[in-house]
Amino acid sequence: RYPDRTSSLIMGGAVMKLNLRGQILMRLGVLLKSVLPYLVLYRFFALIIMPKKSHSEARNLFVREAKKLYQKEFKKWFTLASEINPLLSLFRLRDSQIPTLYIMGEEDHMFLPSITKLVQNHIESTLHVIPNCGYVVNVEQPNIFNEVSIKFINDRKSNN
């Protein structure tokens, strides 16, 4: 709506499209959210999104933060998240032409493929993939995440 208010974006572990597996999981979650305790669902989804042993710190953080939500809030969030694909398609189709850096983990099997495709079609977008890293890049590799982010910000400053 107001593109002049944003000079650049940095998106770590961006979600721009739920792949088929993600869509099925979200629909399954919507069906089960009234039957299963919400923390069971959250732990399950955290394990699906971040399956490797090296992702355990990020997975534990994910679950720890979920505990701060009340079940009613979680159900609202879950319903919202399951309906987000149509809205995200607008962002994928329409190039904002705002310089955007996507920082993704090499082991992010759920969201990296769609970001890779998106960056090919958006002129001002770049992708930095962090090796040996999953979905929550700023937790698993904070030093690399910060270095790449600071470089992007400094490059924008020198271009202005």
Describe each model-derived feature in a short phrase.
Residues 20-22, 38-94:
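Conserved alpha/beta-hydrolase catalytic His-Asp/Glu region
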Residues 92-97, 120-123:
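Short, conserved loop/helix-junction motifs that constitute active-site signature segments
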Residues 109-115:
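Conserved alpha/beta-hydrolase "acid-adjacent" motif
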Residues 66, 108, 134-137:
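Glycosyltransferase donor-binding loop in the core domain
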Residues 14, 105-106, 132:
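Cofactor-binding loop segments of dinucleotide-utilizing enzymes, especially the Rossmann-like FAD-
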Residues 96, 102-104:
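Short beta-strand/loop motif that positions the catalytic acidic residue
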Residues 123-160:
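Catalytic active-site module of serine/aspartate enzymes centered on a nucleophile-bearing elbow/loop
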Residues 1, 5-36:
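Flexible "cap/lid" loop of the alpha/beta hydrolase fold
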